[in-house]
């Protein structure tokens, strides 16, 4: 078992420039050796022991060791072939829709619906409609109309048509009138609490038996703005086992000025009416929605039945449980207005804009949402899977640099100046090398202890003599890494003070991490990705006169 673990750990460490990831290695070992699944505890112990051996090796020593124990080459990566998701009863030219409320920009939850609808529209040579459902004026953020289209463009989603519901009120009025004429709907002026009490008991209210002629007159008064506190209700089954389905409302009075319509209209449709009308008129073949909409689907089926229309194929998928960032649009908006958040792309938020700012590539998010698919079971959003997919995309182009956060000054005596050359990328010789000049004064991140030996990565061993006024004093001890191994010396990153570049990294909690990078970091540009060794990947956001602002992406 030890030899197997050694090969996997060395492969992983060499791939990532001397920094093995034991969790990733555990997964690969179990994936390639199913017989070890009942020996996980034992495997964990072996990984821990082998990890200690590898961590004191230089990258060159790791490569030599791997060639000794696995001369046939590195362990080959194997991936399970995923079965591509299908749509039930799908034919060519499907018509799909993504229908958000423009209350803010899109967040991770929206990404699932938008990606899946786009995926199936492309798969079946169909059409994708963006429908902005803005019939509740209280929930509309004017700038969200444009933001949503920008977010979809970033995701790589091209819609064929954009529909705005607030521009279609006259259409909804026409179908509302027809329902009243057919005696399938009525104007109700009952007190909401009294109606609720009757509904719970399965008792029709007094308005239910009003004639269509009278209801049409009341309807005209509603449209003219002459009535308050009334609603239009759809006649369903007053004895339905689910009280919420009993005579649910389809129109309401709304006096709040609308961002697009102002005060021109006073009557607005509720979601179950407007959605049904639009899905029919737009020829929707399939509707993807969360299983929390199952009751809405049943409500909408009444409208399809009353008009004699064929309903689309409904697919209800499980809830996507997302832990971590803020997803509530109202909380985000309130926080932005109060100054708690810097904007819609604040690193603590779950918006697509925040993911973009942090360095998540749209291709990675798209891929993950397709993999999550349309399963009926609830799914926990796995950040590690998103990060892994993102890493596959950015790793090949991310130059490597040393970065020292919370820097401590170290003065080292007993050794003359020395230049070292390191690869910009372990697999990209075309990136060239980077140069570090040791001149006796460096920054380190680690808290060093007097009397202990440490190995400066790719350099030599030092012994700390004393720490005074926050400055660490040490002397050169030896070059040989075996000496460091014998003394169980930690290997630490370092940055020459003279050539250091100031860097501020903003993490996923919007906390600022101050530090320094090596001088060759100056070759980078805004929006580049780099990997700070033993720290993680970052996206360069801003190049300032006195340094850089970067956003932490992931390990």
Curated annotation (Swiss-Prot):
The keyword Glycoprotein does not apply. Pfam families: tRNA-synt_1c, tRNA-synt_1c_C, tRNA-synt_1c_C2. It comes from Methanococcus vannielii (strain ATCC 35089 / DSM 1224 / JCM 13029 / OCM 148 / SB). Keywords: Aminoacyl-tRNA synthetase, ATP-binding, Cytoplasm, Ligase, Nucleotide-binding, Protein biosynthesis. Belongs to the class-I aminoacyl-tRNA synthetase family. Glutamate--tRNA ligase type 2 subfamily. A motif ('HIGH' region) lies at residues 100-110. HAMAP family: Glu_tRNA_synth_type2. GO terms for biological process: amide biosynthetic process; glutamyl-tRNA aminoacylation. It catalyses: tRNA(Glu) + L-glutamate + ATP = L-glutamyl-tRNA(Glu) + AMP + diphosphate. It is found in: Cytoplasm. It comes from the Archaea. This is Glutamate--tRNA ligase. GO terms for cellular component: cytosol; protein-containing complex. GO terms for molecular function: ATP binding; glutamate-tRNA ligase activity. Its EC number is 6.1.1.17. The gene is gltX. SUPFAM superfamilies: Nucleotidylyl transferase (SSF52374), Ribosomal protein L25-like (SSF50715). Its main location: cytoplasm. The lineage of its organism: Archaea, Methanobacteriati, Methanobacteriota, Methanomada group, Methanococci. PANTHER family: GLUTAMATE--TRNA LIGASE (PTHR43097:SF5), GLUTAMINE-TRNA LIGASE (PTHR43097). Catalyzes the attachment of glutamate to tRNA(Glu) in a two-step reaction: glutamate is first activated by ATP to form Glu-AMP and then transferred to the acceptor end of tRNA(Glu).
């Amino acid at each position: 078992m030890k030899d197997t673990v050694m090969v996997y750990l060395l492969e992983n460490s060499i791939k990532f420039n001397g920094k093995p990831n034991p969790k990733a290695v555990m997964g690969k070992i179990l994936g390639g050796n199913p017989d070890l699944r009942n020996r996980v505890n034992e495997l964990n112990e072996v990984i821990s022991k082998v990890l200690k051996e590898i961590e004191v090796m230089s990258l060159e020593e790791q490569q030599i060791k791997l060639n000794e124990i696995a001369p046939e080459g590195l362990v080959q990566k194997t991936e399970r072939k995923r079965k591509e998701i299908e749509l039930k009863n799908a034919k060519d030219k499907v018509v799909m829709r993504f229908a958000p409320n423009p209350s803010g920009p899109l967040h991770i939850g929206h990404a699932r619906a938008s990606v899946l609808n786009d995926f199936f529209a492309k798969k079946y040579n169909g059409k994708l409609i963006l429908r902005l459902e803005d019939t509740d004026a209280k929930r509309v953020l004017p700038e969200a109309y444009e933001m949503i289209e920008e977010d979809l463009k970033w995701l790589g989603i091209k819609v064929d048509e954009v529909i705005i519901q607030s521009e279609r009120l006259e259409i909804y009025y026409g179908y509302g009138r027809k329902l009243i004429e057919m005696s399938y709907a009525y104007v109700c002026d009952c007190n909401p609490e009294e109606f609720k009490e009757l509904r719970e008991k399965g008792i029709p209210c007094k308005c239910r038996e009003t004639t269509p002629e009278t209801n049409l007159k009341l309807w005209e008064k509603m449209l003219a703005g002459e009535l308050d506190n009334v609603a239009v209700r759809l006649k369903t089954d007053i004895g339905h086992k689910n009280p919420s389905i009993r005579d649910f409302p389809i129109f309401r009075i709304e006096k709040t000025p609308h961002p697009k319509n102002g005060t021109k209209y006073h009557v607005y449709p509720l979601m179950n009416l407007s959605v049904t009308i639009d899905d029919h008129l737009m020829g929707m073949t399939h509707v993807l929605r969360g299983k929390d909409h199952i009751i809405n689907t049943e409500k909408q089926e009444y409208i399809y039945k009353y008009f004699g229309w064929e309903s689309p194929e409904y697919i209800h998928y499980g809830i996507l449980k997302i832990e971590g960032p803020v997803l509530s649009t109202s909380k985000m908006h309130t926080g932005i207005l109060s100054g708690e958040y810097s904007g819609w792309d604040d690193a603590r938020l779950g918006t697509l804009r925040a993911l973009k700012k942090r360095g998540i590539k749209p291709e990675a998010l798209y891929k993950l949402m397709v993999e999550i698919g349309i399963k009926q079971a609830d799914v926990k959003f796995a950040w590690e899977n998103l990060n892994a997919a993102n890493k596959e995309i950015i790793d090949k182009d991310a130059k490597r640099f040393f970065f020292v956060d919370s820097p401590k000054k170290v003065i080292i005596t007993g050794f003359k100046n020395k230049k070292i050359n390191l690869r910009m990328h372990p697999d990209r010789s075309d990136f060239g090398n980077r140069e570090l000049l040791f001149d006796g004064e460096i920054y380190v991140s680690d808290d060093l202890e007097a009397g202990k030996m440490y190995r400066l990565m790719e350099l030599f061993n030092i012994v700390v003599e004393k720490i005074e006024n926050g400055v660490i004093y040490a002397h050169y001890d030896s070059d040989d890494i075996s000496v460091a191994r014998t003394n169980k010396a930690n290997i630490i990153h370092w940055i020459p003070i003279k050539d250091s570049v100031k860097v501020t990294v903003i993490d996923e909690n919007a906390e600022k991490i101050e530090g320094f990078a090596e001088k060759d970091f100056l070759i980078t540009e805004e929006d580049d990705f780099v990997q700070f060794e033993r720290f993680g990947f970052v996206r360069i956001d801003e190049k300032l006169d006195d340094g850089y602002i970067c956003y932490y992406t992931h390990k």
